[in-house]
From Swiss-Prot:
Gene Ontology BP term (one): cell division
SMART domains attached to this UniProt entry: AAA, ClpB_D2-small, zf-C4_ClpX
Name of the protein described by the UniProt record: ATP-dependent Clp protease ATP-binding subunit ClpX
PROSITE patterns: CLPX_ZB
GO MF terms, alphabetically ordered: ATP binding; ATP hydrolysis activity; ATP-dependent protein folding chaperone; protein dimerization activity; unfolded protein binding; zinc ion binding
Subunit structure: Component of the ClpX-ClpP complex. Forms a hexameric ring that, in the presence of ATP, binds to fourteen ClpP subunits assembled into a disk-like structure with a central cavity, resembling the structure of eukaryotic proteasomes.
One Gene Ontology CC term in the entry: HslUV protease complex
Function according to Swiss-Prot or TrEMBL: ATP-dependent specificity component of the Clp protease. It directs the protease to specific substrates. Can perform chaperone functions in the absence of ClpP.
Binding positions for Zn(2+) per the UniProt entry: 15, 18, 37, 40
Organism, as annotated: Acidovorax ebreus (strain TPSY) (Diaphorobacter sp. (strain TPSY))
Cited SUPFAM superfamilies: Glucocorticoid receptor-like (DNA-binding domain) (SSF57716), P-loop containing nucleoside triphosphate hydrolases (SSF52540)
Amino acid sequence: MAEKKGSSSEKTLYCSFCGKSQHEVKKLIAGPSVFICDECIDLCNEIIRDELPTGDAGREGRGDLPTPAEIKTNLDHYVIGQEKAKRTLAVAVYNHYKRLRHKDKAGKDEVELSKSNILLIGPTGSGKTLLAQTLARQLDVPFVMADATTLTEAGYVGEDVENIVQKLLQSCNYDVERAQRGIVYIDEIDKISRKSDNPSITRDVSGEGVQQALLKLIEGTMASVPPQGGRKHPNQDFLQIDTTNILFICGGAFAGLEKVIENRTEASGIGFGAAVRSKKQRSLTEVFQDIEPEDLIKFGLIPELVGRMPVVTALAELSEDALVQILTEPKNALVKQYSKLLAMEGVELEIRPAALKSIARKAIARKTGARGLRSILEQALIGTMFDLPNVSNVEKVVVDEATIEENKAPLLVYREAAKTA
């Protein structure tokens, strides 16, 4: 029963399975002398889903989503150390995207899974931003990074929080469906903390007000975004973006938070049975392991915002050995990058172990962490990279400890002789 002739000369097509005409269904798909309607296709999909064994259904639910172990392994290629943070992030991100797949297929009576946004706490240059970027790249989801210090309340000069959603849309070419499953990283979240425990008469347009605006975005709201990056004005059609399924990762150094934690833990450790341990004996990493939500509230984050970020993980301060590893081991390690740059000039780069340790010590002294490594190495090589295009027969550039510590020029090894300059 594929086709029948009506009173007119044109043919009316019918579904070969249910017999409905093309006018009774949304879509009719043609095969060799047969047709099937969209309703019959939906029915077939339901039958297949219902008859799948439990194990297969679980695998289908996960699809190509990497497991926490696979996510962590990928993070290991780019981020050195921070084992606890990587494991926590891997599980949180895996559960988030598993939750989205469950939500798509869940019935009305099934358990609803809540979103768990993430708060990363750690010193400058410890890898907070790199962790978020690497995650988004691995999962192939839209990613945007925002700076909390540029945000102000709506109506004031500066960016309002909906600009974050607009940037996320731009990153995926205004594909609303993809944007609604993206990742947003908000850096410097600690800089918008309340300046005082007491409410002020003056407006705090970049502090608590921004936290309140971010709260709505993080917990889930319909954000109105002008199409294709235009400015908001009346009588304009807006794109409506549901932020409920966007994963928010917030990061900050939280300088001074260690004092809040120490004051709380010391207050609870008073008495004859309390362990006596001086403040200097505990590193920043150790102190951050004792963090509680009440410490973040005391620091200046509003309780509602703290409650929307249940996954809190602290990143450790990077040691000298860890910084040396960062210089040499990751896929995009700085030494590999500069070696490639010099290789384009036909020159080999050698950075001696003592020089690597010296670079790491300088970064620690500057309190810039891994972020400061590039500027130290750039400073050591800038003169050589300026001269190399005009110098012939250079085979190798050698950076030793004196280059870093005493600002001496790197050694140049020439092809025709082993002389150095």
